[in-house]
Amino acid sequence: SLERIADSLEKKAHNEVDDKVDVAVESSDDTNENENMDYGCSVKEIDVNILIDKLQEKNITVKTYVDSSHENTSLDNVAYFMGNRYNDIRKVYETIKRHLNKPNGFHLDLKNATQSEISASCQLCTTLYDIAFLSEYKYDKSPRYFIHATPNKIPIAINFLTGHWLEIFIRKTIQDSLKSLPAAIEYTYLINPQIILPNGNDFELDVVFLINGEIYWVEGKTGNYQHYINKYSHVANMLNLDKNHSFLVLTDVINPNTTYILSKTFDMTIIPVEEFEEEIKYVFHENLIP
């Protein structure tokens, strides 16, 4: 019953949330490391300039980028949790996002939510509160089943919650997927590089990897993909990337038929966020294993 769920969450939330998020990802990392040892294969990160030169061969000039050695990876586990449990956290995440530019907090009714949605929503809010991305958070158990929260209007929280979490999720998912492959892997990547396209236009890529000499480009959108999808498709053509090398990961498409039609219509693989990990593992298995 909802009352039992609420009672359980109320007692365990602050003790278990970070552990659940961290342990889930750490367990995945441990599994990947064991798989690497079993196969006797290596995953090596190489010089990012090799990727920059590869893009230059396609007449793509990289103007600026963030060195991966300076990248803040402390939010990896939160982003990974959000991506893999997105259907469960959708309602609370979208509510948080809407209130980032509002002065007050919000009250979210979970009376009609599933057990999985309640659990994931409380886990996310507790974690965001613990890392000060929410300035206030409280969960009312039976009979109210309300989340009360206020987003913290600080730059790092706003940047993360408006979409950077999805880029982190994509990058981490790709890195973890590479570790699980029974093949020798050499890779490097860029996050948010500012580039000049062959036609002279400025553009920003979300996540671009070079893996065993092949470029993989992934964009992530947490809303309004309709305004960008045609442009992304044109850029994929400029980069000469097929649908196994160019992806658009979406959070706001619920109907599977929609992503199927989009992928058939545009020159990219368009996929919901919760299906990205399975899809990229399949693509890597097909492309990278001899």
Question: What are these model-predicted stretches?
Answer:
Residues 1-19:
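Extended alpha-helical segments
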Residues 20-290:
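Intrinsically disordered, low-complexity Ser/Thr/Pro/Gly-rich regulatory segments
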